Structures are given as C-alpha cells and as structure tokens.
Amino acid sequence: MTRLCRTFQTAPAAIPNDNSAKFLVSGLTSKGFQAPDWLVPDIEDGTAPSMKDEAVDNIIEHIPDHADDFAGDILPRVEWAYDDANARERGIEQVTRLAEAVGEELDGFVFPKVGRLDDVRDAAGVIADAERDAGLPEGTLEMAIILETAPGRSDLREICQYATDSRLSGLVFGPVDYTAELGGRTLDGERPRWDGLLEALSNETSAADIVAIGGPFDQLFHERAGVTYYNAEGYADQVAYEATIGIDGSWSLHPKQTEQANRIHMPTVEEMERDLHKIESFNEAKREGTGAVVVDGQMVDEATYKNFANTVKTVRAIDETHPAQTEAYYDDDLLARARDVELIFG
C-alpha cells in the first residue's frame, strides 16, 4: 500500500469565533510534520448545527487560496446517516455546492454513519451526480467512509470488495458512534478497544488495496496538580498499536497529534537502513546469478523482499508529497539510496 494517509486530520470548518475559519485555515497552511496527509474540513460533528452553512461557505472561500500550496489531499466530511433522511438530504446539498464551487481543488468527500453496501452505493452516487453537474471528469472525486454503525460493520467485506471497482478509497473507524449504536459501556474509565474490528478493517482494506484509518483519540489533555498537559503518550500508544496491525493511518484532532502520527507511521531510520541493506544485497546476489539468497542469516525470497520494498515505497510516497519531512528525518545518503534503489519485486 503506497497511497499515503498517515494522518486524517479533521478541522471544524466553522467555529463560533470572529474568524470562524480559523481551524480550517490553520490546517491548510500547516508546515513540516504538522502537515497532514489528508485534511478533512469538518461540516458534520465538528461544526455546530447553526453553523453548517457557514462551514460550507468557509470551504468555498478558503480552499482556492490554499489548495495549490497544500501538499496533501482535501476531503470535506459532509453530513450523512443511513437512518436519517434529513441528514442525507443535507449531505447531498453540501456535496453539490462544494463540487460546483471548488470541485477542482478537492480530492473527494468523507461520508459518516454509512449503513450497508446499498447505502455506500447511494453515497457514491451522490458524488457522481455532483461531479457530472459540475462538469468535472468522471472519477475526479474520491470517497472515504466512516465505519461507525452496526450495518456498516456487518457489510465490511462487501463494502471493501465494492471499492475495487468504485471511487471508494478509504475506510475510517468511528469508535464513539459505533460503541453507542451497539450499546457498549465505558467501565472503569476504559472504552472498548474493538481489536477484532480493527484487525478485520486492516485485512479487508488490504485485500481491496484501499487505506484503513484508525479512530480518534479525544483525551488530548490531562490535568494534574493544577497543571494541564498534552497527552502525548496516550495518543502515541494508540497510533503505534494501529501501525502494528497494519492500519495505514491515524485520525488526528490536533496539530500535535498530526506530528506524532506522521512520525510513527513513517519508517524509522533503523528500518530504512535494515531493509535497504537487504534489498541491495539481494539485488547484487541476483546480478551475480545466485539462486537462493541469504542476507545476514535470513533467507530472502520474493515474499520477504516485498516486505522490505514496502518500507522503501512508503518513504518514496512521503518524499514525493512531503519532501521537507523526509529530508528532516533521514540523512542525505540514506534518503538518496531509498530514492535510487531498484525494486525487483513489489
């Protein structure tokens, strides 16, 4: 998987402030490791009901000013719910307005609270209609969905299979609404982890070659002895777990979270050195006509080679989108090797 989405940062598209687009513009102008791979201007839960129209207006006003300089993808989260016709109508209107006004600057839309496969098809149809009405080429706008309902979970495999022949490019876990819909409880201060769901999400999205994104971590700050401090450790633990099971990216609610997730979902210097060494040694052995190849005591075949190649492909994807991040993270020699090495498999 080389589609880049280490970070899925939601930013309220309108807030009750003299500068209601403050967080939207902040996301669009973020630099360095605080620049997300996917910026999600939020018209849904992150924006008060009375400010939804202003949120759409803010996106229309500010996206053209910043889209060319923003390296990542921009996908607004619109209103939608499989069991709420009014929410779907509002979402249709939002998609239609945005596609008409700034469709050329957007990469797609995020639909929350989708139900079974037919509901996902309906959401995709909304984008197709808006795309056509706006005069955009077919397939210009992608779609990501938030998996946060029981019907959506029941059709997870079918939804991912649908992605192989549609504009669906990513699935995002929404644990808060999912827990509420299932009647889950928070006991002893601990929320359900939903390990089985996350592992299924990783598997099914990998099979469909689309991205999987973990859920939000909203315990941003702790307070102790009158001092409030950022909960860096808690978020890092969640992101590291997601990375371990093959979740491609993590939901970010704050620039500090974006910086952490970008780094955690980035191959370490040690990983890069190790995997490049094995790729280079394998390539050299093959040039010399060697059959079986052993590198540092490990038998390397096509399958293990592809694992090493994934590291390089990830770094190349980051380097293409955010060169300032790779240049700050890796030394010049290591980065040059990653850019230049031939990948025989993968």
From Swiss-Prot:
Its EC number is 4.1.3.24. Involved in the methylaspartate cycle. Catalyzes the reversible cleavage of beta-methylmalyl-CoA to propionyl-CoA and glyoxylate, as well as the reversible cleavage of (S)-malyl-CoA to acetyl-CoA and glyoxylate. In addition, it has a small malyl-CoA thioesterase activity. It can also catalyze the cleavage of (S)-citramalyl-CoA to acetyl-CoA and pyruvate. Divalent cations such as magnesium or manganese. Mg(2+) binds at E148, D177. Belongs to the HpcH/HpaI aldolase family. Transmembrane segments: none annotated. The keyword Lyase applies. Its cofactor is Mg(2+); Mn(2+). Substrate binds at V176, D177, L253, H254. This is L-malyl-CoA/beta-methylmalyl-CoA lyase. Gene3D superfamilies: Phosphoenolpyruvate-binding domains. The keyword Manganese applies. Keywords: Lyase, Magnesium, Manganese, Metal-binding. It comes from Haloarcula marismortui (strain ATCC 43049 / DSM 3752 / JCM 8966 / VKM B-1809) (Halobacterium marismortui). It is an enzyme of class 4 (lyase). It catalyses: (S)-malyl-CoA = glyoxylate + acetyl-CoA; (2R,3S)-beta-methylmalyl-CoA = propanoyl-CoA + glyoxylate. GO terms for biological process: oxaloacetate metabolic process. GO terms for molecular function: L-erythro-3-methylmalyl-CoA lyase activity; magnesium ion binding; malyl-CoA lyase activity; metal ion binding. It comes from the Archaea. InterPro entries: Aldolase/citrate-lyase_domain, Pyrv/PenolPyrv_kinase-like_dom, Pyrv_kinase-like_dom_sf.
